Amino acid sequence: MNINKIALIYNHNSKHLAIIEEIKKLYNYCKIEEAEVIIVIGGDGELLHNIHRYMHLNIPFYGVNLGSLGFLMNPLDTKKLLQNIHESTVSILNPLLMQVEDTSGQIYTALAINEVSIFRKTNQAAKFRIEVNGIERMSELVADGALVATPAGSSAYNLSASGPILPLESNMLCLTPICSFRPRRWHGALLLASATIKFEILNTNKRPVNATADFQEFNNITNVTVKSTKDKPVKLLFNKNHTLEDRIIKEQFGG
């Protein structure tokens, strides 16, 4: 990959400003709108926020990890930064499109790179009905919540909720309950990426529910529809010896 123009994004309140200043001195950077690659320094959260902010530009993102986990990031190598970008591999992520309706009848849409989640707002468990492609698959799930995860997001919140990890090219989605009470032994479902999943919230007055698309939260919802979209693909760059697919495989063996 031949790259001449790169933009740099970082948190100006970062505790790693000394390292960031070193990177800034080594290379020349351009405006984000003019870039061929956007470098994001920080952790997964910083990267996700900036993907949402700039994904409309259709510019590849290269994350440099100065956070904790950094699953979507690359290890810091200041002097080989440009070389690693030139030699990087591209992973295409298709986000989830979430549409929610709240108790006032307002409808909102949002995109998620990792997952869409719905969860109880009070101490009482949520109750909801699940449809897949217009067919009722569960008349009542009683749980703390549920989530739909992309392959890239399957090793995040989904894994913590005991959902399976999906290979990046699997063309599937995870539907995973969060602390399911009834049916107690239901552990979720694997669905084709073309599926449309709908959650209808039951007893919203007594058991209010919120929904999130990554970090965007919506309150007091009555229904949520989730589907994958190929209209807004996200390009992530990874070092050739540290690809996202390799990381996903490693996670499945406890790595």
Swiss-Prot record:
GO terms for molecular function: ATP binding; metal ion binding; NAD binding; NAD+ kinase activity. It is an enzyme of class 2 (transferase). The active site is at D44. The keyword Transferase applies. Signal peptide: none annotated. Its EC number is 2.7.1.23. Pfam families: NAD_kinase, NAD_kinase_C. It comes from the Bacteria. Keywords: ATP-binding, Cytoplasm, Kinase, NAD, NADP, Nucleotide-binding, Transferase. Its cofactor is a divalent metal cation. It is found in: Cytoplasm. NAD(+) binds at D44, G45, H49, N114, E115, D144, A152, S155, A156, Y157, N158, L159, S160, Q216. PANTHER family: NAD KINASE (PTHR20275:SF0). Involved in the regulation of the intracellular balance of NAD and NADP, and is a key enzyme in the biosynthesis of NADP. Catalyzes specifically the phosphorylation on 2'-hydroxyl of the adenosine moiety of NAD to yield NADP. Belongs to the NAD kinase family. This is NAD kinase.
